[in-house]
């Protein structure tokens, strides 16, 4: 992977401001271990070890102690964490564990070795903490789980992984709801604090998706829809960056590139690129675009991504970006790569490719192909390919779109399809398209009404020559309507 990948690992492991500030506060409040010992809540062995551990100030001293007493360290941390109920003390232990792992990633092994002897998994001690009420405790536990899973010698699997990924999805979706104003903030957590906690969750996901096996598990858990939901909502640029970073990581896998075709990612990312004022957001979108074109093994997949980028006016954006100066040479390299690849795709672009790409983007406009008699004569039957894939998209747009232009163009295209494909009427009826077009005959927008009416006429009529004369007589009115 690239050097940017390494930077990403550092980014993801660094805590957000609120967690860093709270952790500093927690470290400063030393625990009176002696009182726990006197109350018989902890063993003398654990009390003695934790007090010695706290006295090791330098990383070298701590490392030496962990090399000789790693097993005791894991045992003590877990004993204290599970036997003490006071929130402040649990926070303190979790902070110690997180600091210990952050200083040296290889230290995750002490927890794996200890868990193995107890016939447990390293994360089994921390997963239950995700249900606690205190936000700092929950998010520290989440960070520790991600580090164990990403840096450890064993993979998290099965119900543990499902549980953790579902927790991440729930947290990210709650951010989506907050952003759209569906839920009100409750308790004492401010909106700003809450968004920082969500950034911490996104950081956990970034760490996890660096491991190829977890990418597949995340996609199977419907994680891509979760990411797209956050990106489609107005979220802060930091969370935006983290979500796109996650998409970029997914796209390192050729199989993932194949799978991600169905999510319509390119239009969402190109919209963000157009509005982006942060260099790091621009950089990660370009890197994701590059992965889609570079890591996809199938030529058809590469072409589909390239066409989607062309359809979403990415070429124009790249030309504008090329004029700017960047400190990061990765950006310039990615711009050059993308301009070259998209330029090649434009050369190979057939009118059917153009139409197919526009339709898949869901952003229909009155581009020349829609009005081209030659296009429909040559390509109407091709809308039946891949089990009517394009026709299904067309009818779906008639059902779900609220954009008058999209509805007008879609209705027009249904009409042209049935006019040029002999068995088209029956196909459209089977897909529910006839009823959908009829529903728009009373639409508030004049263009939608007009094109729906024409499409219905084409669905009903048997004498094309007669209809042709009728349409010619109506043309001056439509021209006036458009002006």
From Swiss-Prot:
One GO MF term: proton-transporting ATPase activity, rotational mechanism
Coiled-coil positions: none
Record SUPFAM superfamilies: ARM repeat
GO BP term, example: proton transmembrane transport
Phosphoserine PTM sites in chain numbering: 483
Gene3D superfamilies named in the record: Leucine-rich Repeat Variant (1.25.10.10), V-type ATPase, subunit H, C-terminal domain (1.25.40.150)
UniProt keyword annotations, A-Z: Cytoplasmic vesicle, Hydrogen ion transport, Ion transport, Membrane, Phosphoprotein, Transport
PANTHER family named among the record's database cross-references: V-TYPE PROTON ATPASE SUBUNIT H
Official protein name in the record: V-type proton ATPase subunit H
């Amino acid at each position: 992977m690239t050097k940017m990948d390494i930077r990403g690992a550092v980014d993801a492991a660094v805590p957000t401001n609120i967690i860093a500030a709270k952790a500093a506060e927690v470290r400063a409040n030393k625990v009176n271990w002696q009182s726990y010992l006197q109350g018989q809540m902890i063993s003398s062995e654990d009390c003695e070890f934790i007090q010695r551990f706290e006295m090791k100030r330098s990383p070298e001293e701590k490392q030496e102690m962990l090399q000789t007493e790693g097993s005791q360290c894991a045992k003590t941390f877990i004993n204290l964490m599970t036997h003490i109920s006071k929130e402040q003390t649990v926070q303190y232990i979790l902070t110690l564990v997180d600091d210990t792992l952050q200083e040296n990633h290889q230290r995750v092994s002490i927890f794996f070795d200890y868990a193995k002897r107890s016939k447990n998994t390293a994360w089994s001690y921390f997963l239950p903490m995700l249900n606690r009420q205190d936000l700092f405790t929950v998010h520290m536990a989440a960070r520790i789980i991600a580090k164990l899973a990403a840096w450890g010698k064993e993979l998290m699997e099965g119900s543990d992984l499902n549980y953790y990924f579902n927790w991440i999805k729930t947290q990210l979706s709650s951010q989506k709801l907050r952003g759209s104003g569906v839920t009100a903030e409750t308790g004492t957590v401010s909106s700003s604090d809450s968004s920082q906690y969500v950034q911490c969750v996104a950081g956990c996901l970034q760490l996890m998706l660096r491991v190829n096996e977890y990418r597949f598990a995340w996609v199977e858990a419907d994680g891509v829809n979760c990411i797209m939901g956050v990106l489609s909502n107005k979220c802060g640029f930091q969370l935006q960056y983290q979500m796109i970073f996650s998409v970029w990581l997914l796209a390192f896998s050729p199989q993932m590139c194949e799978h991600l075709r169905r999510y319509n990612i390119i239009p969402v990312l190109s919209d963000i690129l157009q509005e982006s004022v942060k260099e790091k957001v621009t950089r990660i979108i370009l890197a994701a675009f590059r992965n889609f074109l570079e890591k996809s093994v199938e030529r058809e997949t590469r072409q589909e991504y390239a066409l989607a980028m062309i359809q979403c006016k990415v070429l124009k954006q790249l030309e504008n970006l090329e004029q700017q100066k960047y400190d990061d040479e990765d950006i310039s390299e990615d711009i050059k790569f993308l301009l070259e690849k998209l330029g090649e795709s434009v050369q190979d672009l057939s009118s059917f490719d153009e139409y197919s790409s526009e339709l898949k983007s869901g952003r229909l406009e009155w581009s020349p192909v829609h009005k081209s008699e030659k296009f429909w004569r040559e390509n109407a039957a091709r809308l039946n390919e891949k089990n009517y894939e394009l026709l299904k998209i067309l009818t779906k747009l008639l059902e779900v779109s609220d954009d008058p232009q999209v509805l007008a163009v879609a209705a027009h295209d249904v009409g042209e399809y049935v006019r040029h494909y002999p068995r088209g009427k029956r196909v459209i009826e089977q897909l529910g398209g006839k009823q959908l077009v009829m529903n728009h005959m009373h639409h508030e927008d004049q263009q939608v009404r007009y094109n729906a009416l024409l499409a219905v006429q084409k669905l009903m009529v048997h004498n094309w020559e007669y209809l042709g004369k009728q349409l010619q007589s109506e043309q001056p009115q439509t021209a006036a309507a458009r002006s």
